């Protein structure tokens, strides 16, 4: 989980911006989107195979 400490003279906007950046770097949102619905292991293998094939092109 992403965690930041807000400085004394730091505005809420800048703290929120830092928090969002840290969340995107750690992959929290993408992981939550993946886990929103259950993905069967066979579907996961198919998806990874197609991603691998597409990345080679």
UniProtKB/Swiss-Prot annotation:
Q: Does the keyword 4Fe-4S apply?
A: no
The name this protein goes by in its record: Small ribosomal subunit protein bS21
What is the protein's species of origin? Answer: Natranaerobius thermophilus (strain ATCC BAA-1301 / DSM 18059 / JW/NM-WN-LF)
- Per the UniProt record, one Pfam family is Ribosomal_S21
- Alphabetically ordered keywords of this record: Ribonucleoprotein, Ribosomal protein
Q: Which domain of life is it from?
A: Bacteria
An example molecular function term from Gene Ontology annotations: structural constituent of ribosome
**Known InterPro entries for this protein?**
Ribosomal_bS21, Ribosomal_bS21_CS, Ribosomal_bS21_sf
One Gene Ontology cellular component annotation held by this UniProt entry: ribonucleoprotein complex
**Per the record, where are the segments of Basic residues compositional bias?**
33-57
Question: Per the similarity annotation, which family is this?
Answer: Belongs to the bacterial ribosomal protein bS21 family.
Q: What is the lineage of its organism?
A: Bacteria, Bacillati, Bacillota, Clostridia, Natranaerobiales
Q: Does the keyword Nucleotidyltransferase apply?
A: no
* PANTHER family referenced in this protein's UniProt entry, alphabetically: MITOCHONDRIAL 28S RIBOSOMAL PROTEIN S21, SMALL RIBOSOMAL SUBUNIT PROTEIN BS21
Spell out the Gene3D superfamilies in the cross-references.
Ribosomal protein S8
Q: Where is this region: Disordered?
A: 22-57
What is an annotated GO biological process for this record, any one? translation
